[in-house]
Amino acid sequence: MATDGASCEPNFSRAPEDVGATAEAAVATKEFDVDTLSKSELRMLLSVMEGELEARDLVIEALRARRKEVFIQERYGRFNLNDPFLALQRDYEAGAGEKEKKPVCTNPLSILEAVMAHCRKMQERMSTQLAAAESRQKKLEMEKLQLQALEQEHKKLATRLEEERGKNKHVVLMLVKECKQLSGKVIEEAQKLEEVMTKLEEEKKKTNELEEELSAEKRRSTEMEAQLEKQLSEFDIEREQLRAKLNREEAHTTDLKEEIDKMKKMIEQLKRGNDSKPSLSLPRKTKDRRLVSISVGTEGPVTRSVACQTDLVIESTDHVKKLPLTVPVKPSTGSPLVSAPAKGNVCPSVPLLRPGIDRQASHGDLIVSSVPAVPPPNANRIEENGPSIGSTPDLASSTPPLPSNAAPPTGQTSGIASQNYSQASSMHSLHSPCANASLHPGPNPRIQAARFRFQGNANDQDQNGNTTQSPPSRDVSPTSRDNLVAKQLARNTVTQALSRFTSPQASASPRPGAPPTGDIGTHPAVSRTSLKTPGLARVDRGNPPPIPPKKPGLSQAPSPPHPQLKAIMDSSRASNAGAKVDNKTVASPPASLPQGNRVINEENLPKSSSPQLPPKPSIDLTVAPAGCAVSALATSQVGARPAETPGPTQPACSDSSLVIPTTIAFRSSINPVSASASRPGASDSLLVTASGWSPSLTPLLMSGGPAPLAGRPTLLQQAAAQGNVTLLSMLLNEEGLDINYSCEDGHSALYSAAKNGHTDCVRLLLNAKAQIDAADKNGFTPLCAAAAQGHFECVELLIAYHANIDHAADGGQTPLYLACKNGNKECIKVLLEAGTDRSVKTRDGWTPVHAAVDTGNVDSLKLLMYHRAPTLGHSLNEEEPEPGAFDLDQGQEGSEGTAKPVVPTDLINHANREGWTAAHIAASKGFKNCLEILCRHGGLEPERKDKCNRTVHDVATDDCKHLLENLNALKIPLRISVGETQPGSYGCDDFECENTICALNIHKQTSWDDFSKAVSQALTNHFQAISSDGWWSLEDMTFNNTPEPSIGLSARSILSITLGNVPWSAGQCFTQAPWDFMRKNKAEQVTVLLSGPQEGCLNSVTYASMIPLQMLQNYLRLVEQYHNVIFHGPEGSLQDYIAHQLALCMKHRQMAAGFSCEIVRAEVDAGFSKEQLIDLFINSACLIPVKQSPVTKKIIIILENLEKSSLSELLGDFLAPLENRSTESPCTFQKGNGTSECYYFHENCFLMGTIAKTCLQGSDLLVQQHFRWVQLRWDGEPMHGLLQRFLRRKVVNKFRGQAPSPCDPVCKMVDWALAVWHQLNSCLARLGTPDALLGPKYFLSCPVVPGHAQVTVKWMSKLWNAIIAPKVQEAILSRASVKRQPGLRQTTAKKPPSQGQQAVVKAALSILLNKAVLHGCPLLRAELDQYITDFKGGSFPLSIVSSYNSCSKKKGENGAWRKVSTNPRKKSGRFSSPTWSKPDLGEEGTKNKTMSQPNCNRIASLSKQKSSENDPSSMLNLDQRLSLGSDDEADLVKELQSMCSSKSESDISKIADSRDDLRRFDSSENSPAFSAAINNLRMPVSQKEVSPVSSHQTTKRSTSTSKTELSVSRVKSFLPVPRSKVSQCSQNTKRSSSSSNTRQTELNNNSKEEIWNLCKNEQVQKPNK
């Protein structure tokens, strides 16, 4: 800008045009605002102002020249040259310098020059400022461009972040879910691993035990075999001697007879006497030789075999001795070998020989002259008792039949004997097949029974397909043979059909009659199972059989490993040439080889050169393989299962281990029927009965005489052990069966059935008169086995059949002892009810109590200790329980109080062989529960020592030592009493007088010093526990070296202690010890009394209210120092209680000092007037007349509920006298009679007031500076932690001093109640409703009921309906109906709430209920849904619209915005606002986010862009809504806040109660020149739950010229708007748009700054113009 005339010339010439343009613009834009001008407009304004200044300079210069002439004329025109004074004056003015001139009067020109200088200076300053402003403007423009670029970049990044977050969200959820599943699987797998490892350890232990037992059994059997060999050799020697003697006697008798005949005929034959003498000796010698060779095979064994089939085993040795006496002397040499009766009788006894047991059989056992292959009687008898099922070959039936005209084949029989001998020697390692039952699934009992019957005479195909033939009937004619073939075909068909269910599929059978080739005896089935069987060297084979007599002259040594060599030697000795037999022996390998690796050794004996005889069909004996494995049918029964936990002894013989396949094949040259080695072939096994032919069930083979029952008892045992009721009943129906037969271990069928828990089998056997108390070799009876295995039903059945319940085994174990040892609770109960003796001791001195304690079974010990036997005369079912009967479900408390132990003292203190009692065992093993039960017995002697002089305490673990140390301790509850500080009506009724904090353990050796320390430590720990931040038990608190708790209480807070009713002080000592003192005085509790207001202390107040002691002392100091104190805070902040307790404390302090004191309470209500307050002050001597002397009495006045009246009206006149308490500042009050008098407040008067209000407003603020205010904020101490401390103390008291774990449901419910109070106040503060805030008082009544969490929820619903909901409703209505006027106090409309306000209230209640109350409830959702209906306002739908579609208003429509937020130079556009549930925002919607700045509504911009798009109204998608409990509910809370605090609520009245079908309209008016653009924008949803960003919609407000109209749009509320009222909403929007221009102008001119504070009341401030 120019400063001289030359430089101003161009500007001057340009000035008129600029001035004129400016004038026209000024006329048109009167309403220009400097703050809202753009850059071009500012330049225009500056040019206009510059022209004005230049024009003013020209005018000044012209006026200045004109004024100079006038001035000279005016000043010097009156002077005259004749006047010297004037000349002097003129000369003076002209001669002096300008600085030295002192004007005589005021010079207007100097003034004008000064003004011009000032203007010039201002002009220069203004030019400088304009230049600086222009540079700042440029800089600002650059910054704005950078800011816009950064905003766009930020929006792009935010959009990309939201998209990535949306993409990754489901991946994270899936990963979290998968992680949870994997963690659960890990836990399950760990548990399974632990179980498997436990089972593995048990199996290892069992395996080791079995190995030891097997090794012991092997040694025993070896010794027994040696002994039997010795006996056998002795028997052989004796037999040979007797046989030689017999031969001599027979020869002598024959000689004598011949001599007699000779002497009779001597007279007649005197001539021939000399000739006949040499011929008589020769036949005798020949006969002797023949008798020696064939004497064993006479008919004697046949008669004995029939007679001794049921004889006892003990008689076997006698039969051996008697055997030679039954041999006939004269065999029929010319007759056929087998007569007709003999032929018919050979078959029943043929399959009874078992070399699996007769391992030392020799040739003499089998050499038969008249009947082939008839076993000796002892062999027949052993077949009945032999336990080795499935391992015995039917060797007798393998003897080839001979033609009737053939001579006795001595060589062949000796070969058979050798074969039998070799087979027998290889069978000693075979196992019993019962364990094989676990390998094959058991068939149905009906199938077995059918096979049992159908195949009594049938042949079976073995597993390799080799067909065998059944024994013939007695009719051996060809016709009967044809019938036999047909019968065999039919039986084979049935067998094959049944085999599908019971055995593996048979392979193709080779040609019948062909000799077997290759390894016939291979049996891969067992080896494939790969089951490890410990101790393969021996098996349980039952009782060892008696050894048959050997052939004279044979070796007495044990059989060699390869006995077939002996067969070769014996066959070479044969003297008579007969039919040659091909002997094929397959010997088993040594038993020491592991299972699965056994090798089948096969050696073919050289065949004889004699031609083979053709097969004779008259006698076809089946060839049974020796030692073949038992198939599924042989060992499978219904109910077959592996052996259970080892009982008192080893398993029965029928429950032995796996079958080891050992194959011995025999091939006859007469009838070459090949026998498979893998075919099951034991005569007494089930498979023989089912698939072969059985003598006892074959009527076709009955040829006279009783059928032999060999193997039936063993089969009976197997059926009983496996629970096959069908087979067992069939066997029991057979005649002559010994049901009491016992195997080698002494296990009978009844024992096996009871051991395996087969109740039906036990009942069948008991009904069949089985011996109920038959004991095994270890003395265990069936009742012992059932009790040990836990089969209580079998125990009941055996007891019902009068079993001996007190039977003691060899080791002294009774059934009760075994049941206790195995922890079988039901069996123990049954035995005790049967009256068993609990005091029976074992050989080691153990009692059932020892056994129960040794296993750590608490239930078993409780039954032994407390279960009473029924009285005589009452049955078990008729017995009525006694009042003190023990119940296992009662737990410890039930057994302590009512039941008395029935175990005598001597039994509970009985010591075993080592001197250990049951308490020793329990303490040493750490069974604390068992030891505790034993300690409850009054007669327990814990000081009893064992043989090593150790007491129970010496061998106990740490836990048990602690229990023993507290054994005789008295548990006295320690309680804290607050005395007379019970507030009653002055405060909270939920305070408790006494609280149990712990239980003191007082021992006999406890001293009074120890007792004092224990009480002090317990109090300190308790104070620390209730003031800590978490749930800690007293055992977890280690506060010995820590400072005092946060509440300020310690052992020094104790006033007195009472032991029962006897007062006691810390450190005091009585003559008796504490233990004796407590017992003598029957002190049931120790009560600690805290010092309270009566003693001038606040300790009891602190404990009762949980307000820290230091803060209470501070409040008391404020009252005593300032005299005027007001306690204010939210309702329920214990203001009245605190004031009253402080008053009590002050009163007792003053009384202790010798002053009288009085407390005056006054409850203020709406009708309480100032006159009443004056009378109160005067009557209480607080106000005394000026004339009266001061009083010494202390007066404490408490004004309660001051919030119900106006403080300024009530206390306004008392402020100055209360602040200056002296006669110098009196106040005059008028009495009721009209007289007035001067009064003043004296120094001994204290005034306390309580206000249940968060903050003061209006005129009440004038009172604030005259009082000392104590604010009790809900979010600050002492109120903030008071509820937590109080509820924690309540829980500790409920649990009698033992704080539960944080996971306990009670702790969770208490934490929930605490969280509800915090969240509720936080939400109410966020809503801007401080009047609805609540103190902790209402939550102090939270119920603490263990196990009943629903009680707390019901209490919360009642609290919500009675207190919280009405306060919130009142506060929300107050906010919604506020008329906001600038500079004035808010006034509440008294009209009833409108429909929209009711909707606001319902929405607020629903949000608070779900966000603050129900959120975090530990109840399950299903349980919580049952109580939601009890809460008021819980039915309001929270599916509020969460997304809006942007739509411009139609032409001619206007809307008013409640909150204007504009950004300069933003073009209008249409944006589709996405749903809140989807994080990916559109690009345009993201670009137009509004900056949330406080003064954003003050920025305006001119828009010259026309709106080119009009969006129609659209329906809201009902699926795009807020879900229950989402984070976006806080957005609705903020929207409610902004709605309630806005100036215009034209649309609130249109809100329905609860409608989700909503429609929203946004409209803008279009004009020819300008149109307002509407951008529906929103802030991104915050991820923080505490303060989510609210969603706002912002627009740009444009200011147009005189040709345009101002168009302002309005933010719509997020509350539901019904569809039916869309027209009303639209019309109302039009009406409100008419005045929007004026209101908006006023807003822009008058509002300097508008801050949206959610916690304070908004006010509009006017700036000074």
Swiss-Prot record:
Chain residue ranges for the region called Disordered: 203-222, 368-480, 500-620, 875-902, 1447-1495, 1575-1665
Stored Pfam families: AAA_lid_NAV1, Ank, Ank_2, CortBP2
Entries under InterPro entries matching the protein: Ankyrin_rpt, Ankyrin_rpt-contain_sf, Cortactin-Actin_Reg, Cortactin-binding_p2_N
Subcellular location: Cytoplasm, Cell cortex; Cell projection, Dendritic spine
Compositionally biased residues, Polar residues: 388-399, 410-429, 470-480, 1656-1665
Secretion signal, residue range per the UniProt entry: none
Coiled-coil region(s): 120-277
UniProt keyword list: ANK repeat, Cell projection, Coiled coil, Cytoplasm, Methylation, Phosphoprotein, Repeat, Synapse
PROSITE patterns xref list: ANK_REP_REGION (PS50297), ANK_REPEAT (PS50088)
GO molecular function: protein phosphatase 2A binding
Residues that bear Asymmetric dimethylarginine: 500
Segments annotated as ANK repeats: 711-741, 745-774, 778-807, 811-840, 844-873, 914-944
Residues found modified as Phosphoserine: 1526
Biased composition (Low complexity): 455-469, 1590-1604, 1623-1641
Assigned GO CC terms: actin cytoskeleton; cell cortex; dendritic spine; FAR/SIN/STRIPAK complex
Entry annotated with the keyword Phosphoprotein: yes
Record note on quaternary structure: Interacts with CTTN/cortactin SH3 domain. Interacts with STRN, STRN4/zinedin and MOB4/phocein; this interactions mediate the association with the STRIPAK core complex and may regulate dendritic spine distribution of the STRIPAK complex in hippocampal neurons. Activation of glutamate receptors weakens the interaction with STRN and STRN4.
Function: Regulates the dendritic spine distribution of CTTN/cortactin in hippocampal neurons, and thus controls dendritic spinogenesis and dendritic spine maintenance. Associates with the striatin-interacting phosphatase and kinase (STRIPAK) core complex to regulate dendritic spine distribution of the STRIPAK complex in hippocampal neurons.
Protein's name according to its UniProt entry: Cortactin-binding protein 2
Organism taxonomic ancestry: Eukaryota, Metazoa, Chordata, Craniata, Vertebrata
